[in-house]
Design a protein with these regions (language model features):
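A glycosyltransferase accessory/donor-loop signature
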Residues: 1-11, 17-18, 27-29, 166-272
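A structural signal for isolated positions on well-ordered beta-strands in alpha/beta enzyme cores
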Residues: 3-5, 32-34, 72, 115
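Structural alpha-beta junctions
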Residues: 25-32, 59-72, 199-203
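Short internal beta-strands
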Residues: 32-39, 142
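Active-site-proximal specificity loops/subdomain of glycosyltransferases
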Residues: 41, 46-106
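A short acidic, often aromatic-flanked loop/helix-cap motif at beta-alpha or helix-coil junctions
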Residues: 76-85, 148-149, 210-215, 231
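GT-A fold catalytic core of metal-dependent nucleotide-sugar glycosyltransferases
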Residues: 77-79, 97-144, 154, 163-164
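Conserved catalytic core of nucleotide-sugar-dependent glycosyltransferases
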Residues: 127-184, 192
């Protein structure tokens, strides 16, 4: 069983569906997907939690692939408010939902090994290859951040993929320390920087497990459709997600996931 953690609000349904389709199309291993969500409409009317209907449909899709697959919906609204409500980092670079992974050690249902994935990720090969990496002596495994490893520190990582050893995380209080930083220190990339600063021991692994720019590389397992910095013909950023099919064809020249995305469109129409 591969244990996956996805976080977000009701707007991440497209990302979760595309990602899980690509994942389950490339593995025979059973998948247990934990969906961590919350309702935070006090900040934004769009910040509604992943619905029970959305979670149930995702589980139905997964079980068509493998009857042992499962989806567990975790509403952590009260826990979030207790830990982070009103803190300075609620207005972080993305949304407060980026902070949810920092609550994982407080959730009894979370197992000892857990693969956290950002919602803008697609899986290009068997996810088991990543999940079976040995992290016994580490808090987590991660891949260097494309820009941060040059601009911040050589070992600065991208938190869009984190293979957690939750047993060690609880022992070292990694996430507890990260939450304290979130409450007390304003940071630009709050969740990522808090984990980085709170780390005791991490394992840096190959970029094939969090490829952040070139999605046609042979052997790549995780393709991360994160924001990219382009310098030519003028400095700018580019941010196209996998469910924006026309855009990833036109601007990213990415056709790797066309069959998955065709399936996604059929499934989305079925859900609606």
């Amino acid at each position: 069983m591969i244990n996956i953690l996805l976080c977000g609000n009701s707007k991440v349904f497209d990302g979760a569906l595309t990602q899980l389709v690509s994942m389950t199309n490339r593995t025979t291993e059973s998948i247990h997907c934990f969906l961590m969500t919350m309702n935070l409409t006090r900040l934004n009317q769009d910040f509604t939690g992943i619905s029970a209907e959305q979670a149930a449909f995702l589980q139905e899709v997964l079980r068509r692939k493998n009857p042992e697959n499962a989806v567990t919906l975790l509403d952590v609204t009260d826990l979030y408010e207790k830990e982070f409500g009103g803190c300075a980092n609620e207005g972080a670079y993305c949304t407060p939902y980026t902070l949810l992974r920092l609550l994982a050690d407080l959730i009894p249902e979370i197992p000892d090994k857990l693969l956290y994935l950002d919602i803008d990720i697609m899986i290009a090969n068997d996810i088991r290859q990543l999940y079976e990496i040995d992290v016994t002596d580490y808090e987590y495994a991660a891949v260097k951040e494309k820009y941060g490893c040059w601009l911040i520190r050589p070992d600065y990582f991208n938190a869009g993929m984190l293979l957690f050893n939750m047993k060690r995380v609880r022992e070292t209080k990694l996430l507890e320390k990260a939450r304290e930083l979130i409450r007390t220190k304003k940071m630009l990339f709050a969740d990522q920087t808090a984990i980085f600063k709170a780390t005791t021991k991490k394992k840096l692994i190959s970029r094939i497990y969090n490829e952040q720019s070139k999605f046609d590389r042979k052997g790549t397992v995780v393709c991360h459709f994160c924001k990219r910095l382009l310098l030519l013909p003028y400095p700018r950023t580019e941010n196209y997600k996998q469910w924006q099919i026309e855009e990833i064809h036109k601007y990213l020249k990415c056709y790797t996931f066309d069959s998955d995305l065709e399936e996604y469109l059929r499934l989305k129409a079925e859900f609606e």
